[in-house]
Amino acid sequence: VLGSRGLGDVYKRQQRTYVAVIEGRPEKDTDLIVSNLVENKHMQVYVTQDGDGKEAITRYRLLQTNNRYSLVELDLETGRKNQIRAQMQSIGHPIAGDSKYGAETNPAGRLMLHARRLCFIHPVTGEEMRFETRIPEKFTSTAK
C-alpha cells in the first residue's frame, strides 16, 4: 500500500491532455498560461492578479482554425478545478458552448472540451497506463 507521498508522486507524473474548440484565434500558436485561480462564493473559479489562489499551468497548441473558432490541444501541468475554462476565458478565448465562462456561441449544443489523453504510472504495479480518445468530429468540423 502506498502512503500519501507515493500517491502524490504518481499524481505529479501523470499527463492530462485535452482538446477544446475556443472562440476566435489566439495570438500565439503555442503558449504557456501561468496564473493563479481562486473560487468565489458562487463556486465560480477565476484568474486573479493579486497573488492569491493556487497556481495553475496550462500549455496550449493551436491545431487548426477558421479564425471564428480554433481547435487547441491543452496539456495540464497542474490540475485545478475549471482550470482550462478559467484560463481560456482570461486570454479572451472562452471555450465554445461555455456560457458560464464567457462564451457567446454554442455550435455543438454542449461545452466543446474533451479529454484526449491520460497517462500515469499505476501506483501498485508501476506500469505505465495510457488512455487515448479520438478528437470528436464536431470539433474538427467547427474549426475547419
Name what the model sees in each region.
Residues V1-Y11:
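Single conserved hydrophobic/aromatic residue that forms the stacking wall/gate
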Residues D9, V21-S70, A86, R130, ...:
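Glycine- and acidic-residue-rich catalytic/RNA-contacting loop of pseudouridine synthases
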Residues K12, N40, I91-P94:
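Conserved, well-folded catalytic cores of nucleic-acid-processing
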Residues G24, L76-T78:
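Non-cytosolic beta-sheet module surface loops
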Residues G51-K54, N67, E77, R85-K144:
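Pseudouridine synthases involved in rRNA/tRNA modification
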Residues V72-L74:
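SH3/SH3-like beta-barrel fold
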